[in-house]
Swiss-Prot record:
InterPro entries per record: aa-tRNA-synt_IIb (IPR002314), aa-tRNA-synth_II (IPR006195), aa-tRNA-synth_II/BPL/LPL (IPR045864), Anticodon-bd (IPR004154), Anticodon-bd_dom_sf (IPR036621), Beta-grasp_dom_sf (IPR012675), TGS (IPR004095), TGS-like (IPR012676)
Record note on cofactor: Binds 1 zinc ion per subunit.
Catalytic activity: tRNA(Thr) + L-threonine + ATP = L-threonyl-tRNA(Thr) + AMP + diphosphate + H(+)
Gene field: thrS
Protein name: Threonine--tRNA ligase
UniProt KW Transmembrane keyword: no
GO biological process: one example: threonyl-tRNA aminoacylation
Region (Catalytic): 242-533
Amino acid sequence: MPAIRLPDGSVRQFENPVSVHDVAASIGAGLARAALAGRVDGALVDTSFVIDHDVDLAIVTDKDADGLGILRHSTAHLLACAVKELFPEAQVTIGPEIENGFYYDFSYKRPFTPEDLVAIEKKMAELAKKDIPVERYELPRDEAIAYFKSIGEAYKAEIIESIPQGEVLSLYREGNFTDLCRGPHVPSTGKLKVFKLMKVAGAYWRGDSKNEMLQRIYGTAWAKKEDLEAYLHMLEEAEKRDHRKLGRQLDLFHIQDEAPGMVFWHPKGWTLWQQVEQYMRRVLIANDYQEVRTPQIVDRSLWEKSGHWAMYQDLMFTTESEKRDYAVKPMNCPCHIQIFNQGLKSYRDLPLRMAEFGSCHRNEPSGSLHGIMRVRNFVQDDAHIFCTEAQMQPETAAFIDLLQAVYQDFGFDNILIKLSTRPEKRVGADELWDQAEAALAAALAAKGLAYELQPGEGAFYGPKIEFSLKDCLGRVWQCGTLQLDFNLPVRLGAEYVSEDNAKKHPVMLHRAILGSLERFIGILIEHHAGAMPLWLAPVQMAVLNITEAQAEYATEVAETLKKQGFRVDLDLRNEKISYKIREHSLQKLPYQIIVGDKEKAGALVAVRARTGEDLGQIPLSQFIERLKSELLH
């Protein structure tokens, strides 16, 4: 006689074992119709799951985040079902839920076309309308292998062959289609009403470039039509803001095949870069960081000592000279410890904050490269804080203050935080992990910051905090990190003399605020749609003459502004003023200064702001004061 406790604290008693669906129906017919799954003692299960003992139960609907995930995963299965009906020779592989949607990988004799996607989506809608039951059943491992081989699904059989002997596997059947899956899934296809197929891309089987190239169909699924429409609108906006397109339009940078994943910065783009880097340099100096510079190429022996050679070699660019193996550094931390190790350090020297705008190289797969957001050569605003165990919490708190101030200056107020704690495989005593996790949590609590706890997601050498930005389109970008490390200082022999005259290893805090400068600049470009704030704009204003008669005065105006430290373009071309204004507007300049005969005669300037505001004719000195005031804010 199971007693079932619901989220509101009420308890329902049942005479016999009962399914999740039956419990929902006992509460109300509306909830029974809305139920997509259940959460039994914290575990997600199908609505058909039978409860035969006392449990805590929550009914999952499309209003829950879990419910949306189940909708998307189930829509991936619906996609596979539709593909198999239309293209029986296609073989199915994997089809997970992803952020904002799902995908499914197929092996097929020819590429899927845009017309195929239209037909597949239409078939999915037909199958959804039929409200086909989705049924879960189990098979022993070897029977499951035999079943998938018998229907020609070699990839599914291969997946199961990698599962240990003796396992019982769950399968889901909807109509004529059966898939291997842990679930849970919606009770029937009729729950899947709001979806759209987005694109086809290539993907290697098991993510290995040595394997066959499969076809990955991406889609999106939502609970309500309005949610889908809002998402598609966001994608339209994101396309307009695509940093790759704006990078070309605004003449900021380019990437070419001869240097994949590496950026050619143009003068305007490099000016933007310099504004970001110089700002961060001022911030570092104000917060007692010491800037250093370390080598690009380091002997293999150091990477072996640090553990990177064993754990990270596939992502490292290597070379050989004079019978010695070298690696181009993928990160800066081992080199910073080499500087720390020069000379005896005392506890009085700690905390020691060491920063570097370090150029790193990682051999990322070519398929993962994306503009300047995902590159092979990047610069981090990297720093390492060497401190005592007692200093972990105050250093964490100081870093959080610094990070929040920096993000605010760049126009980001919405910060999401995750705290990742000890994984199963780790180094260091549990007491040290207790202290480290408590230090990070206490620093966040002291600031009144909400965070998502991610148990077991820390690195093997220490817990970490991740900071993500939410941009104007609601997209989330992970940028900042704070990572405690008990391991690397020990491996590389970093020591200091403690207050009791004993040699101890410092705790090392790996920290970054922007992360990769390339990626952060890409985020800035998309967040601002290329219309950078005055302080960041590569060109802050253009001075335009109407006719040749004002050329000399326009030059004087431009020179005066340059002497005040502003970044100015002077446009004396013999073109119509309307043409020049339009051209500079497309470059998204904060201001345009137009000088004609009236302005010249009155020693004035006519100013147009990017916002559409017309400042009228004003003395140049008054405009300069406005600019200085704007830069202060």
